[in-house]
Amino acid sequence: MRINPTTSGPGVSTLEEKNLGSIAQIIGPVLDVAFPPGKMPNIYNALVVKGRDTVGQQINVTCEVQQLLGNNRVRAVAMSATDGLMRGMEVIDTGAPLSVPVGGATLGRIFNVLGEPVDNLGPVDTRTTSPIHRSAPAFIQLDTKLSIFETGIKVVDLLAPYRRGGKIGLFGGAGVGKTVLIMELINNIAKAHGGVSVFGGVGERTREGNDLYMEMKESGVINEQNIAESKVALVYGQMNEPPGARMRVGLTALTMAEYFRDVNEQDVLLFIDNIFRFVQAGSEVSALLGRMPSAVGYQPTLSTEMGSLQERITSTKEGSITSIQAVYVPADDLTDPAPATTFAHLDATTVLSRGLAAKGIYPAVDPLDSTSTMLQPRIVGEEHYETAQRVKQTSQRYKELQDIIAILGLDELSEEDRLTVARARKIERFLSQPFFVAEVFTGSPGKYVGLAETIRGFQLILSGELDGLPEQAFYLVGNIDEATAKAMNLEVESXLKK
């Protein structure tokens, strides 16, 4: 891994010889900067504007060079508000791209796009920084072995398994359990894989970012008493930030994740919420730079921008970055260029269902809508594949019978269909699971269920061996042995009541 050798802390590197320019034009978040002949900065170099505005307030704005215009001018996009900037102000070329702090000291902290901490906990205790612009790993470095990334969550591991070093799309509206699922994954990768997580909040609401931080502290994912024991680093570039910040915050989070993968040789989970906002910010910047828009008004470089981010998210021989990306679908139109370009990179989709959440089935992952390219016999094995297919078939048949049940009732079904419905209801409940991070809310201890245990449990339900057990025994338990123990307890309780 190429680590920028600067020891100047986050944001930008320093040069002994300053290359100075001056602001020639300001159009919103875009600056044109004039430099002396022969002293033009490179594309993606960080420029810093320091000075005072008309009322004497200190200004410190970092920009990134996007275009070389000719006539010794460059066009740069600001990473923070340009309020108070004036023509003629001095601009320093740092001679390097934006660099952000990396390493264990970033865990438990919140950063902005420049790698500056924004959580009022003081400076970050690291002198190692890394530039946010890097090429993707070379073919020779990639790990080509297809392997499943075990999450310990039954419904995910059985029906839509994640690929180690893969990319997963997370679809779900408000209030169906996206945040809790994300926090459980962060918790499980730390405990089962010794891995860490990086969360990139790209263009979402500031309130949601604050809520996530508070919930992480409450559930122990971020350890307030000993910040070094935390399992996640947070990088936020929210809705109120300029488009330059929203466009680059995903790269800041990815750079932190790459260090854990390449130097610490760990498995890393990278969350991006929301990948659509990354595209949206790129579209705004593209228009500000005067590029001709493409389909539906998106930037002509949409595929290139998405590819440059997604291709860096991969498994190497050192470690892996597995990415879970929340995908907003504008107007529910899956053919929109933004989600359509995202789908090309995804290995699996996890769809959260409001109907399941309303029934109290958590995690509310839809077993029929969620998909994975990993669910093939040659990758997961015949036993896993057959069990998953039978679970899906049983769930699909139950879904088809629901209208008949609603109109005529269960008694009008054939004996075979009644058996299918009974097993499907047990499966539906057994797909629920108590989470470690939800212990503080539910009072039930969390459960991590290995893949072999998950397959065994569903095979027993499908075989009919557990037909005599009540369906409530399968609700919010870990493995199948807990379900049988719960059934015995329910039987004892009912006998005592009599």
From Swiss-Prot:
The keyword Membrane applies. This is ATP synthase subunit beta, chloroplastic. Belongs to the ATPase alpha/beta chains family. It comes from the Eukaryota. GO terms for biological process: proton motive force-driven mitochondrial ATP synthesis. The keyword Chloroplast applies. It comes from Myristica fragrans. SUPFAM superfamilies: C-terminal domain of alpha and beta subunits of F1 ATP synthase, N-terminal domain of alpha and beta subunits of F1 ATP synthase, P-loop containing nucleoside triphosphate hydrolases. It is found in: Plastid, Chloroplast thylakoid membrane. GO terms for cellular component: chloroplast thylakoid membrane; mitochondrion; proton-transporting ATP synthase complex. It is a peripheral membrane protein. Its EC number is 7.1.2.2. SMART domains: AAA. Produces ATP from ADP in the presence of a proton gradient across the membrane. The catalytic sites are hosted primarily by the beta subunits. ATP binds at residues 172-179. InterPro entries: AAA+_ATPase (IPR003593), ATP-synt_VA_C (IPR055190), ATP_synth_F1_bsu (IPR005722), ATPase_a/bsu_AS (IPR020003), ATPase_alpha/beta_chains (IPR050053), ATPase_F1/V1/A1_a/bsu_N (IPR004100), ATPase_F1/V1/A1_a/bsu_N_sf (IPR036121), ATPase_F1/V1/A1_a/bsu_nucl-bd (IPR000194). Keywords: ATP synthesis, ATP-binding, CF(1), Chloroplast, Hydrogen ion transport, Ion transport, Membrane, Nucleotide-binding, Plastid, Thylakoid, Translocase, Transport. It catalyses: ATP + H2O + 4 H(+)(in) = ADP + phosphate + 5 H(+)(out). NCBIfam families: atpD (TIGR01039). F-type ATPases have 2 components, CF(1) - the catalytic core - and CF(0) - the membrane proton channel. CF(1) has five subunits: alpha(3), beta(3), gamma(1), delta(1), epsilon(1). CF(0) has four main subunits: a(1), b(1), b'(1) and c(9-12). GO terms for molecular function: ATP binding; ATP hydrolysis activity; proton-transporting ATP synthase activity, rotational mechanism. The gene is atpB. Its main location: plastid.
